[in-house]
Amino acid sequence: GTLINEEWAEFFAKNKPRRINITLYGSKNETYENLCHMKDGFDKTIRGIELLKKYEIDVKINGSLVKKNFHDRMEIIDIGEKYDIPVRIDTYMYPSVRERTTPFNFHERLNPEDAAKARVEILHREMGDELFEQYAKQTIYLAEHTEEGDACPGHMTCRAGQSSFVVNWQGMIRSCIVLDQPSYDAFDTTDDFMTLWNKIVKETEEIKTSMECSQCKLRHVCNTCAAAAVAECGDYEGVSKYLCEYTKETVRNL
């Protein structure tokens, strides 16, 4: 968002994307300076959003909640409402590699209890009373009535490598933005796109996730996945203690 100027806005108006996602890291310049080390980052991002709106380009605001912007969470939603832009704030953050083996209170991200509480609070605000009540009832029902699963490895259940893919800044096509495999050069003309896509589908199908998670009674309301397992544990079949606590606390707060 900080890089969007009049020239770029005009470019996107002529070459219209389906949507541009802009991450707001805070609701004021002070937060941007503290978190992103950019004194005027908030002003620049808002200017970028206003330019995209001016040129009638569809925009969505994303938020990534950590300790340093925790108190800005509701103000970020206010900004979305002001500009009539949908907002989605993520309260679960992947850990950095150096944080995998450190206690939660030493992480830059929120501890799982605070992250779960914020998740419920934010979802309530984003959904409104009626829709949130339906969501809460459904989630609690699933948490309380799901039987223990079979003792077998799980598999990728999201759209990655099934109906979606990403191309990163290096031009590598992958099933998931977080996972580094499978990965192929999108600009390698040796194979056509469908050949690359079929390779990605096949290799994604071969990824196995935790047997323990497959058996868990909270599996239908938990955010764990192959990407989270790798980020948290360094292994597709790892079990994240952070996500276990995050899920239990989410259900409790509903």
What are these regions (language model features)?
Residues 85, 102-103, 133-252:
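Accessory C-terminal segments flanking Radical SAM cores
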Residues 5, 109-113, 192, 240:
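Helix N-terminus capping/helix-initiation residues
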Residues 6-10, 200-201:
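A generic local structural motif
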Residues 5-6, 29, 70, 206, ...:
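Structural motif corresponding to alpha-helix initiation and N-cap regions
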Residues 1-3:
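Short beta-strand->alpha-helix junction loop in the catalytic core
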Residues 10-160, 169-170, 174, 178-184:
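Radical SAM enzyme [4Fe-4S]-AdoMet core and its adjacent flexible, acidic
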